[in-house]
Regions:
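Bacterial N-terminal signal peptides that target proteins for export
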Residues: 3-16
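Sequence/structural segment immediately N-terminal to covalent heme-attachment motifs in c-type
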Residues: 28-45
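Axial heme c-ligation environment in periplasmic c-type cytochrome domains
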Residues: 41, 50-61, 76-103
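Post-signal/leader-peptide non-cytosolic segments of secretory proteins
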Residues: 64-73
Length: 111
C-alpha cells in the first residue's frame, strides 16, 4: 500500500496546537493555584466581589516595573487602603514562589 505524505497544513495545525498548550498550560495552572489558595473566594477576573476584580488590579499596575513585587507583598502580607475600606488579610500560607505565579497570572489578565 502506497503511503502519501501528510499535507503541508498538518504541520501548521500541529505547531498551533503545541503553542496553544504551551501558553494555556501555565495560565490554567496558575488559575488553579489561585483557586487552591482561596483567592477566588474574594476576587474574580472581571467582577468586584469582596476584593477588586483582577482586571482592575492589572489595569492599576500597567506599566509599573514593580507591579509583581507589590502584588506578591500584598498577597503574603495583606494590605489596606488600596481598594477601599476592606483590608486584605495576610495569606502567609502562600509561598513566595506561588505568590509570584499568582501575581504574574493577575497581571497577565487572569485568564
Amino acid at each position: 500500500m502506497k503511503q502519501h505524505p501528510a499535507p503541508p497544513y498538518r504541520a501548521g495545525q500541529v505547531l498551533g496546537l503545541v503553542a496553544l498548550i504551551a501558553f494555556a498550560g501555565p495560565a490554567l495552572a496558575n488559575k488553579a493555584l489561585a483557586e487552591k489558595q482561596g483567592c477566588l473566594a474574594c476576587h474574580a477576573a472581571a467582577t468586584k466581589l469582596v476584593g477588586p476584580a483582577y482586571r482592575d488590579v492589572a489595569a492599576k499596575y500597567t506599566g509599573d516595573a514593580n507591579a509583581s513585587a507589590i502584588l506578591v507583598q500584598s498577597i503574603r502580607n495583606g494590605g489596606a487602603g488600596k481598594w477601599g475600606e476592606m483590608a486584605m488579610p495576610p495569606q502567609k500560607q502562600v509561598s513566595e514562589a506561588d505568590a509570584k505565579k499568582i501575581a504574574r497570572w493577575i497581571l497577565d489578565g487572569a485568564k
